[in-house]
């Protein structure tokens, strides 16, 4: 199925979770990362149980800290 992830169209297996998507993208779950699914925040504890669907839009946001 096709989804949008951080502005890129991707083909992922049906039934993929956010956790699986992050693995496909080579992303490591970190404290300074936020994942949105269709503009809704997904809590880190829900990555393994949140399933993406055809045409979903996922944004992976890395927070920047510093002064």
Language model features: what each stretch is:
Residues 1-66:
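Ubiquitin-like/PB1-type beta-grasp interaction modules and other compact soluble beta-rich domains
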């Amino acid at each position: 199925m096709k989804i949008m992830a951080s502005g890129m169209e991707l083909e992922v297996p049906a039934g993929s979770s956010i956790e699986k998507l992050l693995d496909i993208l080579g992303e490591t779950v970190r404290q300074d990362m936020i994942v949105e699914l269709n503009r809704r925040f997904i809590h880190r504890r829900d990555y393994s149980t949140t399933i993406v669907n055809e045409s979903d839009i996922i944004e992976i946001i890395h927070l920047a800290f510093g002064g």
